[in-house]
Structures are given as C-alpha cells and as structure tokens.
C-alpha cells in the first residue's frame, strides 16, 4: 500500500516537502510518482534541481543553485520532465551557464554581475524573429530528423536547418510560408493516426540522452588545429576523442583555446567546466576580435561558437550538467550535417563535482575518493563523439570531436581521472611540466604522446599531401634517435660521437626549436596551415639528407656546418612567413630555398 499523500497540489502537479539539506544535496519527502532525473523546483525561490536517487517516497535531489536559506518543510515542485536544453536558431554567438541559462540576458534583467537565485530566463530569445524558408509543402510525408525549413542564422553559418524532433512523424497538414517568425511560433502541423501535432522552430532534448543517428561511420577526415606538433605528429580526425592532460601552467587552456579558434570545424562548443573565471573572460574578449576567412570575407570566430561557462565559484552540481549540456548542443549541430568540435576544460573538475556529490550521498568511495562509476560516466560522455549519418532526409553526415583537458594534481598521469580517460580516448596530447618551465610551448612531450588515427588518415594524406606520412615517420624516428644520443652525450661528451650522429643531434635541436615550438601570440605562428607544415618538414629533412650524403662522401661535418650557416638561418626563419600572404607566394619562396640548398650542397661536395 502506498504511503498516504499529504502534500499540496500546484496547478494539478503534486508537490513534496524538504526533509533535509546538505550543501547542494536536498532530500525531499512525499514525492510518490517522481521519476529518476526529473527536473524539480526546490524551495520558495524555485531553485532548479534534478532527482538523482529515489527511496520509498523520498527523493534525493542535486540542486544546481546555491541552497543557502532553504529550510526543512519548504515545498518541492515537480515539473514532470527531465533536465532538457532548448535547441534552435540563436544558440551561436551566445554564452550560457551549466544549465543553459543565457548569462547576457540575466545580466540585463538583473543589472547585477551575479546570477539571482531562482531566475528562469529562456535559453533562446523568444522575441527575436528569424527569416524562415520552408523546404517542404502540405501533403508531404515527414519523419524524425527530416529538414522541413531553413533559417538564416548569421553571416558565418547562413543555413541553419530546422529539423523535426527524432521521435515525430506524419503528414504535413500546414506549414508556414516564407517569412519572419519567432522560435516558439507553431509554424508546422503534422497529422499521424488522426492526431494533429504542431511544432515550432525550436525543440527541447533531455541532456542525458544521446541524440539518435541513422548509423555511425568511421571517421576519415583530419581534425586540423593549426599547431604544427599536433597536426604533423599526433593528428586527430573529425569525430575523434582527444585528451590533453597536464599539470598547472603547462598550457592546456591555451591549446584548447587555439583549437577552438583555428580548427577546421564548422561549429565550436566551448565548455569552461570548473576552471578560472578569467579564462572564460579571456575567451569572451578574444573571440569577437579574432576573425576567420569565409568565402573571401572576414568573420569573427564568435559567430560559430557557443560558450558554456561554469566557473569554479558557480554551484558544484551544475558542473556535471554543463558537460552534458555542451555535448547535446554539439549533437544538434552534428544532426544538421556539420563538423562540431567540443572543448571540455577541464574534465577533472567535473570528476571532482561527481566525487563531492557522491560523498554527500554516502556512496562507497573508490580510488582517491572518486565514485566507482567514474570510468562509466567518462565513457558515456566520450562515446557521444563520432562521425554519423544523421536521421532523416536529405542525407547528411556530421561529426562531433571532443577535446577534453584533464588537470591531474601535480601532473601525475596515474591519477584515476587521467587513467580512466586514457582508456577511452584515441589521441593523447601529453603536456610536460619540464618543457613548460623551459618556455617550450606547446609543451607536448613527443615521447609519451600518441595518436591511434595515423593509419586511418594515410588515405587522406595520399590524396592531398603524398609526402606527409613519410616525412612524419622520419621526424619521429629522428626525435627518438636524438633522445638516445642525448644520454650518450651526457656520459662521453659530443666530441666522441660520429659525424652522422652529430647531424642527427643538430637537426633534432633545429626541429625542436623551430618546428615543434610555436608562438600562439604572434600573427605568423598562432596558426600554421597544413601546407606550410609540410614544406617545413620537407626542407628540414631535405637538409638532413643532403648533410648525410656529404658526410658519406668524405666531408667533415664541422666544415659542412660552417659552409651552410646561411641555409640553417633560413631553415630557422621558415616559420616567420605569415600564412595570410597566400599559399602560392610562400610556396615559391620555399621552392627557392630548396633549390638553393641543393646548389649549396653540390658546391660543398665538389670542394
């Protein structure tokens, strides 16, 4: 027999009462019929919360806002729906908090730099009108995921496809004409089994449920980020998963910001999860100023970006939600047939939020106090990446790439979050504290980093840049040989080495200082296109090969090195060419250097 219901009713929905409060975790009683992960409003301020455990008529709720002032006996209002995000025109060029409340709108409404408690501002602007163009007509059959109209979003993404929710279907009985409408106006009516349903341009989707796709494809296009060391040695694919673990001050945030600024994705979702507020402020300041070229005109990068800010002083529980909010927004753009990159900075703070809530729930702690289900939670997040065939027609392919920064305490890669992440992701960009202290940025440790996508991408390289895989393998071999030689030099000194080994060491130094290092704050080096990377590899390895040939023909390396000082200076200044001058002009300069190198070595060998 069910316990007697003694709670009040508001608008026909049963309300419970608060039984206990412990930080962000609230226990409510008299909650018969509540569902797991249902959205509830807690207390008189109607704070947003989510049910995470049910025991009899008691429900445990994690509250996404500050719970100060909430008392035992306060009402808990059920909404009857899960925590969901609004998806539609207006997501781009916007900044939200972890549960998709628009921060700019809240600032305008409250005239405060703080978010008032219990504020309920819709995520998408309800007043703004969008230019809608229908792509279907009355009488057409329509199924989940079909594109039934397009909207002009902004000058960067001119076609925002309007999709039917995945579980809907039927025959169109009414569709609006071309014109301007708001996101909540019902502009489509569909009939199925005699029942008519109306749809607006926007749709809602529960954040914990992955959006369905027709089928998953294997990824085969590279995810280029404009950092030479990453594009050349450890590339990822569109739809790949990347982890960037590193101690404090190693440059994780600079790498993830440069990935979001310069990657070849169509849309960027940047989730600042439990990191410093200054970093989000920096993104907000930098992105509108930075531009990227689209069809011959410059557009600010902010127009292709959605920011989700959940800084370290915001409520802990909302950190967990922010990651899911971000990935759901990314999946929505993926379903339109776009390549989306999602940055999560940092997943360690997310895991710490899980640990805190798990501790308050009294769950059994596992390694370092993290919950036993940490690995499963991380996997369920990273597995939402990938390249898919979207639902519905017309057929379209889209992808979600996830780049997760991990901050292990003290840079210890055996930390549970790092080790769980490395078991899931396919690309590992390991940052090294020693390199960062030497001001070698990006501080990627080439001996521990890896990418499992190299063989998948070989077909693309064969088609576009045939020499690339060979040059990449040779540079990796050269770097690993130089590490072994470094140990020999420490024991017996450089003079004891043979000439070919001296060349290897000198070339490795040149590659480390002038190829792997990159100044993210300069106009010539903040972004390096793949053709420039290939030419730099070609010229540096060309110098290495010519030098080895000269030694094989009896020359002395010291003499050869002195005779080719000017060539080495040119190799060191290859990176100073500004990509915006144009590929053709810069490639001609590089070809001239290549010819000069061949002539110089020919004259050195003849001496």
Swiss-Prot record:
How it assembles, according to the record, is:
V-ATPase is a heteromultimeric enzyme composed of a peripheral catalytic V1 complex (components A to H) attached to an integral membrane V0 proton pore complex (components: a, c, c', c'', d, e, f and VOA1).
Topology of this chain in the membrane:
Peripheral membrane protein
Organism placement in taxonomy: Eukaryota, Fungi, Dikarya, Ascomycota, Pezizomycotina
- One term of GO molecular function: ATP hydrolysis activity
The terms describing its cellular component in GO are:
fungal-type vacuole membrane; vacuolar proton-transporting V-type ATPase, V1 domain
Protein name as it appears in the record? V-type proton ATPase catalytic subunit A
**Matching InterPro entries, A to Z?**
ATP-synt_VA_C (IPR055190), ATP-synth_a_Xtn (IPR031686), ATP_synth_asu-like_sf (IPR023366), ATPase_a/bsu_AS (IPR020003), ATPase_F1/V1/A1_a/bsu_N (IPR004100), ATPase_F1/V1/A1_a/bsu_N_sf (IPR036121), ATPase_F1/V1/A1_a/bsu_nucl-bd (IPR000194), ATPase_F1/V1_b/a_C (IPR024034)
Q: What class of enzyme is it?
A: translocase
Sites binding ATP sit at 246-253
Return the similarity comment: Belongs to the ATPase alpha/beta chains family.
* Catalysis performed (reactions): ATP + H2O + 4 H(+)(in) = ADP + phosphate + 5 H(+)(out)
Q: Domain of life, per the record?
A: Eukaryota
The enzyme's E.C. designation: 7.1.2.2
Which BP terms from GO are recorded?
Answer: ATP metabolic process; intracellular arginine homeostasis; intracellular histidine homeostasis; intracellular lysine homeostasis; proton transmembrane transport; vacuolar acidification
Q: Name one Pfam family in it.
A: ATP-synt_ab_Xtn
Protein task: Catalytic subunit of the V1 complex of vacuolar(H+)-ATPase (V-ATPase), a multisubunit enzyme composed of a peripheral complex (V1) that hydrolyzes ATP and a membrane integral complex (V0) that translocates protons. V-ATPase is responsible for acidifying and maintaining the pH of intracellular compartments.
SUPFAM superfamilies in alphabetical order: C-terminal domain of alpha and beta subunits of F1 ATP synthase, N-terminal domain of alpha and beta subunits of F1 ATP synthase, P-loop containing nucleoside triphosphate hydrolases
Write down the CDD domains for this protein, in alphabetical order.
ATP-synt_V_A-type_alpha_C (cd18111), ATP-synt_V_A-type_alpha_N (cd18119), V_A-ATPase_A (cd01134)
Answer whether the UniProt record assigns the keyword Ion transport to this protein: yes
- What is the scientific name of the source organism? Neurospora crassa (strain ATCC 24698 / 74-OR23-1A / CBS 708.71 / DSM 1257 / FGSC 987)
Keywords of the record: ATP-binding, Hydrogen ion transport, Ion transport, Membrane, Nucleotide-binding, Translocase, Transport, Vacuole
The places in or outside the cell where this protein is found are: Vacuole membrane
């Amino acid at each position: 027999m069910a316990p007697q219901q003694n709670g009040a009713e508001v608008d026909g929905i049963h309300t419970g009462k608060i039984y206990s409060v412990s930080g962000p975790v609230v226990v409510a009683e008299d909650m018969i019929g509540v569902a797991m992960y249902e959205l509830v409003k807690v207390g008189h301020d109607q704070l947003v919360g989510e049910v995470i455990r049910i025991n009899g008529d008691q429900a445990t709720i994690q509250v996404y806002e500050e719970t100060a002032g909430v008392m035992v006996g306060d009402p808990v209002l059920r909404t009857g729906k899960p925590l969901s995000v609004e998806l539609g025109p207006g997501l781009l060029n916007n900044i939200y908090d972890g549960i998709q409340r628009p921060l700019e709108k809240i600032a305008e409404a409250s005239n405060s730099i703080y978010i008032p408690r219990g504020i309920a501002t819709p995520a998408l602007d309800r007043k703004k009108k969008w230019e809608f163009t229908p792509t279907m007509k009355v009488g057409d059959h329509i199924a989940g995921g079909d594109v039934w109209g397009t909207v002009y979003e902004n000058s960067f993404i001119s076609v925002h496809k309007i999709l039917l929710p995945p579980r809907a279907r039927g025959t169109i009985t009414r569709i609006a004409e071309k014109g301007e409408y708001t996101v909540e106006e019902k502009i489509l009516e569909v009939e199925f089994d005699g029942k008519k349903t109306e749809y607006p341009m926007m749709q809602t989707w529960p954040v914990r449920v992955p959006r369905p796709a027709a089928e998953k494809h294997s990824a085969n296009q590279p995810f280029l980020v404009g950092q030479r060391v990453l594009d050349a040695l450890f590339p990822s694919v569109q739809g790949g998963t990347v982890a960037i673990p590193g101690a404090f001050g190693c440059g994780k945030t600079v790498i993830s910001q440069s990935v979001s600024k310069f990657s070849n994705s169509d849309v960027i979702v940047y989730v600042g999860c439990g990191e410093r507020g200054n970093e989000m402020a920096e993104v907000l300041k930098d992105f509108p100023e930075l531009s990227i070229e689209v069809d011959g005109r410059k557009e600010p990068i902010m127009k292709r970006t959605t920011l989700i800010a959940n800084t370290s002083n915001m409520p802990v529980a909302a950190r967990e939600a922010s990651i899911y909010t971000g990935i759901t927004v990314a999946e929505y753009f993926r379903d339109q047939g776009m390549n989306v990159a999602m940055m999560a900075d940092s997943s360690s703070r997310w895991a710490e939020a899980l640990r805190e809530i798990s501790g308050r729930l009294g769950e059994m702690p596992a390694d370092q106090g993290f919950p036993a289900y940490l690995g499963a939670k991380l996997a369920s997040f990273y597995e939402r990446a990938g390249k898919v065939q979207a639902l519905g027609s017309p057929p379209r392919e889209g992808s979600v790439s996830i780049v997760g920064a991990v901050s292990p305490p003290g840079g210890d890669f055996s930390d549970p979050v790092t080790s769980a992440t490395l078991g899931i992701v396919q690309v590992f960009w390991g940052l090294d504290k020693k390199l960062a202290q030497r001001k070698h940025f990006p501080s990627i440790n080439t001996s521990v980093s890896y990418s499992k996508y190299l063989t998948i991408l070989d077909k693309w390289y064969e088609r576009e840049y045939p020499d690339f895989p060979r040059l990449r393998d040779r540079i990796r071999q050269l770097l690993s040989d130089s590490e072994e030689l470094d140990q020999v030099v420490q024991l017996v000194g450089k003079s004891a080495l043979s000439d070919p080994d001296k060349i290897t060491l000198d070339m490795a130094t040149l590659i480390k200082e002038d190829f792997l290092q990159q100044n993210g704050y300069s106009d010539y080096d903040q972004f390096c296109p793949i053709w420039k990377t290939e030419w730099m590899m070609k010229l540096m390895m060309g110098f290495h090969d010519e030098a080895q040939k000269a030694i094989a023909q009896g020359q002395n390396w010291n003499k050869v090195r002195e005779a080719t000082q000017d060539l080495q200076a040119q190799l060191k200044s290859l990176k100073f060419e500004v990509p915006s001058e144009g590929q053709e002009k810069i490639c001609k300069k590089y070809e001239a250097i290549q010819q000069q190198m061949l002539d110089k070595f020919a004259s050195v060998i003849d001496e």
